[in-house]
Design a protein with these regions (language model features):
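Zinc-dependent metalloendopeptidases
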Residues: 2-309
Length: 309
């Protein structure tokens, strides 16, 4: 009996293995490489090196506000120069990494993280690592805290007469995104002086929400799955875009990005907040698939400081 079972088991394996192999191949085919994957083979690079794809690293840092070459020849070459080293040190300081100026493992890992497309540094003025000391009155004493929120250049904000804002979705927006975005607006309303209401008038709404892909005409193209996830513009522009090519989910689901979490972050930009260096803050720039976050004290302090209340 046992001897007959072995050939039968082998026969089943011969039938199943090709199917499993095809499933694995199909899964690999569906998984597109991250736009930031090029960073992996640059790990260990430092000043003085000349390595293929360093120009892509320069472009990455330029996109997020860390680097700007007057001479475009240097921007497009693969030389690890003084400017690049300085930009990497600034990036490392912003993300609480050791400021070595080299592409060590921790720096590469952080740079490869999916993130918001809004720059960390805008025209060289807005720094995540600001570490602003604030005094918060508490009875007869002042509570001393260090804040890490930031603002857009010039500190744009909604006028005092416009504390109620309307928002609208682009007609045809996926139905499962409506409730998470509405909840995100409700959360900000509960923690600020703002109130929000949904309108069907997309043209005249104060804030517009849509899913876009690649170059969509706003000067900030998306880059496909796993790179930049969403972006929004400073007051009083009002545009908020999700990357349509990402996997999105209403719940915190492995392999997908949480719609409400990213909405909370981008609404922060819509209200005037830049990025924070506090990892627990909603305004921290990077997000992982399956991650769910809420507002942090630093986010709320930032809005209160910007609007002076």
């Amino acid at each position: 009996m046992g001897s007959k079972a072995i050939p039968f088991f082998s026969f089943i394996l011969l039938l199943v293995l090709p199917l499993l192999f095809q499933a694995v191949l199909a899964d690999l085919k569906d998984k597109k490489p991250s736009p930031f994957e090029f960073l992996q083979h640059l790990q260990g690079c430092h000043k003085g090196d000349k390595v293929k794809d360093i120009h892509k690293l320069k472009k990455y840092l330029e996109n997020f506000g860390y680097l700007s070459y007057k001479n475009k020849t240097h921007a497009n070459d693969d030389d690890f120069d003084d400017f690049l080293e300085s930009a990497i040190k600034t990036y490392q300081l912003n993300y609480h990494l050791k400021a070595t100026g080299t592409l060590d493992a921790g720096t590469v890992s952080k740079m490869m993280s999916p993130r918001c497309a809004v720059q960390d540094i805008i025209n060289g003025t807005s720094r995540m690592r600001s570490g602003k000391k604030r005094n918060h009155p508490s009875g007869s004493k002042s509570v001393h805290t260090v804040s890490h929120y930031s603002f857009f250049e010039g500190e744009p904000r909604w006028p005092a007469s416009q504390s109620h804002l309307t928002y609208a979705f682009l007609p045809g927006t996926r139905a499962d995104a409506i409730s998470p975005v509405a909840k995100a607006f409700q959360t900000w309303a509960a923690n600020t002086h703002f109130s929000f209401s949904r309108t069907e008038d997309y043209v005249n709404a104060d804030i517009t929400v849509s899913f876009e892909s690649r170059d969509h005409g706003d000067g900030s193209p998306f880059d496909g799955p796993g790179g930049t996830l969403a972006h929004a513009f400073a007051p009083t522009d009002g545009r908020f875009h999700y990357d349509a090519e990402e996997q999105w989910s209403v719940t915190a689901t492995p392999g997908a990005y949480h719609l409400e979490t990213l909405a909370l972050h981008e609404i922060g930009h819509l209200l005037g907040l830049g990025h924070s260096s506090i990892e627990g803050a909603i305004m921290y720039p990077t997000f992982m698939a399956g991650e769910s976050k809420g507002l942090h004290g630093d986010d709320i302090q930032g809005i209160k400081a910007l609007y002076n209340y």
